[in-house]
Each structure stands twice: as C-alpha cells, then as structure tokens.
Design a protein with these regions (language model features):
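Transmembrane helical cores of multi-pass secondary ion antiporters/exchangers
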Residues: 1-371, 378
Length: 378
C-alpha cells in the first residue's frame, strides 16, 4: 500500500506541476483520498503522525540550512531574524485575537477561550520552509533586493519560534497558568541551547566528514543523516530547540568545505522530497474530511485574515526599522507567506497532549493550510 501511495503521489505531483497546482498540497490530497473518508485506509494515530512529521521536518530544515549560503543571507540577516521571531509572535497575537473574537459570534459553531485561540494561531504562525524552498527554486524566480535569501532565511528559522509558542501555550493551558518569568526563561533556554548546540554539533559534523576515512563513500551521506538525528535528539534532551539546532547545523555544514559534497547534496535532496511526500501523505490519511466541513467557514475567514491583515501587518511592523527595504519588497514579503505541512504537524501537539478543542485546532489548521497554499501559489 505504501509503495502505491508513493507512486500515485509522484505521478499526481508531476501532473499538478504542469498546471501550476502546488505539488506538496497534492500529496496531502492523495492521502485524504486514500484515507478513512476515501478508499478506507485507516490511520488515526496522531502520535505516529507527529513523530513522522518531526523526523521529516528535521531533515527538511537541515537540508534547507545546507542550501542557505551565508554570503547571500548576510546583507539581510537583521530583517530575516526579526521576521522569524518577532514576526511570528505578532502574527500569532493578531490572529489569536481575531479567532477569539470570531469564536464568540453567535453564527459560528465554535467557541475557543483566549488561550486556545492563541494556541491555534501559534500553530499557524510560521511560513513553511518546505513550501518556500520548493516553490522559489522550482519556479526559478529571479527576485531582486535579496528577497529570495530573506524569504528562505525567514522560513527556515521561524518554525522553531512557532514550535516554542505552541509548546509554551500547551504548558500554560495544562498548568492553569505559568508565570511570565517561566515563559521568558523557557524561550531563552530553548533559543540559547538550540543555537549553541547547532553551532557546536555542526562544527563536529564537518570535522567528522573530513577526518573519518571511510572506504565506502556512499556511507558519508548516511553518516551525516545520523548526525542530523543526533543533533535534534541531544538538543531536545538538553531542553533546547531541536529544529533551530538542525537548521543552524545545516548552515554550518553547507558553508564549509566537506568531503563528497556532491554525493551528500544529491542524497539529502532526494531524502527531503521522500520525507515531504511521506509527511503530507500521513497527515492526509489522518484527516477526516467530513469533520472539516463543520469548521470550513471559520477556517476560510481565518485564512483570509492572515493573508490580508495578519501577515502584512506583522511584516510591515517588523520591517519598519529597515528603511532600505523598498515598499514593493515589503508587499512581496507580506504576500509570500507560504504555508505547508508545518502548521498541521504543530497542530498534532495539542491533540497528543489532550488539550480541549484540539480536534477543532487540527481541522482548522488543515483547511487553512490548504486554502493558503492554493491562494499564495496562484
């Protein structure tokens, strides 16, 4: 069954690419068609889907880090980091308040308290690295004013911020409130440990690749893959942000001389696509489309708000200090807030944690991701 799903996904993806349909979105649709409301393939374990998503996102972020050239991102390092941190926070705040206001309306069929509304917004607050890397490079866009590296830096580094917001809000809800000091401390520890571990382990990976004399050169990419998983795991064990660590480690490896670079890049590129397909398929299988119809209108309104108000407002506020960035560039960055599977992956965390209203969060995230990906790609 798995081989059939992979084959169908590749064929459908190739067909969709010709007509300008988002390839990654089609993988999600294939999973839904084969799922419980389609051909009847049963997959209901959110914890397994979360684990698959975690592995896939680690590989995607590391590969994205390898493709991020420091010379390209250096001129836009300031705005890129602000967008990936403050931008995510503002997007979550604005959208969370809108969801809270919307859920209190008599004509909506949901009611979410302010904390759950902010949690829903946090899961959707980051742009998707897989979608950004895939679309900007496959379409070969000739963007000026360093827009491509800015968007890639933002998308590669803002997932950790959205992840931290999601985890902190889940802890806040389950503990009936956390102190401001505990929240700030959690953010600082995750950032510091994640960044430090990514830098140190990235350096160690470079040294191992260049110093270890392995007779079979095909094992070098596998060695690096093992290092990706080790980096994520040890950082998570140290209470740091594993996603930030693997992204920084990827930047370190990609911007230094390493043995068998071509073989490693080819291996990682193929592996990234494989796990993107698997990730979207699993998330599609996990979904029950009939349940999404109940929140379709609300999800659509949230999507419209984020695309037309939430994202642009956050971008313009974040880029205010950077006067050299033109108005056209600000508008483009505001519009290209590409979404993919990351919000759905993060939406599995409330489900696994048993947060009240988690099924609503998951279904809205899926519908929003589908709408946003389709509108932004067009």
């Amino acid at each position: 069954i798995g081989s059939i799903l992979l084959f169908v996904s590749i064929v459908v993806g190739k067909t969709g690419y010709r007509f300008g349909v988002p390839t990654l979105l089609l993988f999600l649709v294939v999973g839904m068609l084969f799922g419980s409301d389609g051909l009847g393939l049963q997959f209901h374990d959110a914890k397994d889907a979360q684990f698959i998503g975690m592995v896939a996102l680690s590989i995607i972020l590391f590969s994205g880090g390898m493709d991020t050239k420091f010379k390209e991102i250096k001129p836009i390092l300031g705005p890129g980091i602000v967008l990936s941190t403050v931008g995510v926070l503002l997007t979550a705040l604005f959208t969370g308040l809108f969801i809270w206001w919307l859920s209190g309306m008599s004509w909506t069929n949901i009611y979410l308290p302010i904390t759950t509304s902010l949690l829903l917004a946090a899961t959707m607050s980051s742009t998707d690295s897989a979608s950004v890397f895939a679309i900007l490079r496959s379409q070969k866009m000739n963007l000026k004013h360093n827009l491509r590296p800015m968007l890639e830096l933002e998308s590669g580094s803002n997932d950790p911020m959205a992840y931290m917001l999601t985890i902190v809000l889940i802890q806040f809800i389950q503990s009936a409130g956390m102190g401001v000091g505990a929240i700030v401390g959690s953010f600082v520890i995750q950032f510091m440990v994640g960044a430090g571990a990514g830098y140190v382990l990235g350096k160690l990976a470079i040294r191992m690749l260049n110093k270890l004399n392995i007779d079979n050169q095909a094992l070098y990419p596998i060695l690096l893959l093992a290092f990706v998983f080790f980096t994520f795991s040890i950082t998570d064990l140290l209470k740091g942000n594993g996603y930030l660590a693997v992204y920084i480690a990827g930047i370190m490896v990609g911007n230094n001389k390493i043995m068998h670079r071509k073989d490693i890049y080819t291996f990682m590129d193929g592996l990234t696509w494989l796990f993107q397909i698997i990730m979207f398929l699993c998330l599609g299988l996990l979904v029950n489309p009939h349940e999404m119809l109940e929140v379709a209108v609300v999800a659509l309104l949230i999507g419209v708000f984020m695309i037309l108000i939430g994202r642009p407002l956050s971008v313009f506020l974040c880029l205010l200090p950077f006067r050299k960035i033109t108005m056209k560039s600000r508008l483009f960055v505001s519009w290209v807030g590409l979404r993919g599977a990351v919000p759905i992956i993060f939406a599995t965390y409330p489900v696994v944690a048993g947060v009240e209203g988690s099924n609503i969060i998951f279904n809205i995230c899926l519908l929003y991701t589908s709408d946003a990906a389709d509108e932004e790609d067009s």
